[in-house]
Amino acid sequence: MLKWNSLWCVDNVAADGHAPGEAAPMRTTLDEELMTLAITVAATARRRSAPNPWVGAVVVTSDGMQFEGATAPAGGPHAEVTALAAARAAGAELAGATLYSTLEPCSHHGRTPPCTDAILAAGVRRVVVGIEDPDPQVAGRGLVQLQRGGCDVEVGVCAEQIAEQLRPYLHHRTTGRPYVVLKLAATLDGRIAARDGSSQWITSPQARQRVHELRAESQAICTGAGTVRADDPELTVRHVDGSDPRRVVVGAAPANAKVHPCLEWDGPLEGLLDRLGAEGVLQLLVESGPRLAASFHRGGLVNRYVLHLAPAFAGGDAPGLFAGDGAGTISELWRGRVVSVCALGPDLEVVVER
């Protein structure tokens, strides 16, 4: 039986998460505990899996043994196959097992065979899925294939947490563009530098470490030519594990700039996002000065703002977060939704979404 309990549903599914005429599925505490474990496992693949989603899977055999798997780098096995392989390596009996996966298993041939084939071949009896995969090549087909193969399938356990974890992937697959994260660092009164232009460093080492984590989670990083000329940044990943993102400069970078090799872009930002999305960039991190930040912001192109605030004041006419004119009236204020607030050493990180 295919049971639906998610906002990510195929057609003909009621708003409360189950098919019309069908009783709402019963969710067990154990299901939520094991899906929470799968979410934790998925996080270990966050910096390595792109352009594939970072997925976690947990296999529970009929005698209670548990095995985990996360998405390997592109071209390697997906989370479900990795978890099944771990069970086999331990000599576990998979017939009648339950498999938990944060994302719908794929049912198509890509760089790897379909995960649904591996699940059915193993004799798994029940599959619990966090959310449906909006990728047009999947989009519910994996769930239907599992059901037709004899699996009991439930969708929607811990759906909100998983949708948050996979937000860049989901955005990319539904829009064709990367998820844009604008990182900003400022004093409490919103100043990004002193009057003389000096800005190193407003925030603490802990906040700067977080910036390197954001870089490691992104497949591309963007700045403006003005920032390159002023600061000559490398825009690489340091202090944390992860690969360097592809570097993008809006405008022309000096020939001897540390940011090379990079993509130099001289065109509409919308076109840049279209290109990067087509090339498999799931998340674009923007680290720039106030002019380029304002262009992304006022163009409605930012999906998430990550603001690092130091407990300091600059005052006066020191440079602010965005160049250009601000809101003329209170009614013109841009307002977002606070996702999280946390301490980074002496600083605050405030994450806001559109």
Features from the language model and the residues they span:
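Short, compositionally biased "basic patch" segments
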Residues: 58, 83, 87, 176-185, ...
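Zn2+-dependent cytidine deaminase-like catalytic core
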Residues: 58-161, 246, 295-297
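Enzymes that bind and transform nitrogen-containing heteroaromatic metabolites
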Residues: 4, 8, 12, 18, ...
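A structural motif shared across PLP-dependent enzymes of the aminotransferase-like
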Residues: 47-50, 54, 75-79
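Active-site beta-strand termini and strand-to-loop segments that position acidic
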Residues: 61-62, 174-175, 353-354
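Proteins enriched for Cys/Gly/acidic motifs involved in redox and nucleic-acid/cofactor modification
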Residues: 48, 76, 143, 157-185
